[in-house]
Amino acid sequence: MIHDRIEDFLASLPRTGALAGLDLGTKTVGVAVSDGLRRIATPLLTVRRTKFTEDAAKLKAIAAERRLVGIVLGLPRNMDGSEGPRAQSTRAFARNLVQVLPLPVGFWDERLSTVAAERALLEADTSRKRRAEVIDHVAAGYILQGVLDRLDWLGREGGA
């Protein structure tokens, strides 16, 4: 099931279990995973996109190996909050993904996640070559950590 509101997505999940965060690009998919208690997001890998069926098979394997209970897709909104062609492409990917990987899917505003990831990698004095290799899954980590922080906040506020 696909949830537009992150609160609805979080409410659909079991109390524990790992989540994945995906940073969907035209050529790659950055993947990050959480721990089972959903406290920490860890960048995992970058999948080179080929055909959807092959991409989905790789994501299914990760979901099985990590025992995922849900997936968060970064939703690329424009700076004014509107959705453009990239956001529509992300929504289409989600619709296709739930057909082959029946897990709850939620969206998280990914504006500036790649900028934050790039800044963190620069501050860590990461080489240009290494930054290019890891930027997508580091950005996925930022996306997923945002969701985990929201979940924590909702829990403290009694909303989840």
Swiss-Prot record:
GO terms for molecular function: nuclease activity. CDD domains: YqgF. Disulfide bonds: none annotated. The keyword Membrane does not apply. Keywords: Cytoplasm, Hydrolase, Nuclease, Ribosome biogenesis. GO terms for cellular component: cytosol. Its EC number is 3.1.-.-. It comes from the Bacteria. It is found in: Cytoplasm. Belongs to the YqgF nuclease family. This is Putative pre-16S rRNA nuclease.
